[in-house]
Amino acid sequence: MKAERESLESYEEEFTLCNKLGLHLRAANKVVRVASRFSSDVWLSRENLEVDAKSIMGLTLLAAAYGTRIKVRAKGVDARAAVEALGALIQSKFEEED
């Protein structure tokens, strides 16, 4: 029963995009690479639109510019780690120079 409970772990946090270009293609590619390291299902959402964080096409649909609040949500055994890793990427401005 414990393993089943762990597989259903869900975690979410909100972050603000603080890089000048927002969630552009290069940044979206980095999100996909980080999210794909985890077995959990991972989503990013903006307002009423939620997309798979492992899909670059989905991420481009968010059209998230500088200052946009993004919710990162994950469900699975490593949900918290996935959200924290993506949060660190977002807070690092996608490791890009301003």
Task: Set out the residue ranges of the language-model regions.
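Positively charged, low-complexity intrinsically disordered leader regions
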Residues: 2, 10-12, 18-21
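C-terminal structural segments of small proteins and small subunits
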Residues: 65-98
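Intrinsic-disorder/low-complexity, polar/charged segments enriched in Ser/Thr/Lys/Arg/Asp/Glu/Gln
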Residues: 7-14, 69-71
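Short, intrinsically disordered low-complexity segments
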Residues: 1-4, 25, 45, 72, ...
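Compact, glycine-rich, soluble single-domain proteins
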Residues: 16-66, 74
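Long, contiguous binding/interaction regions
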Residues: 2-6, 33, 61, 81-85, ...
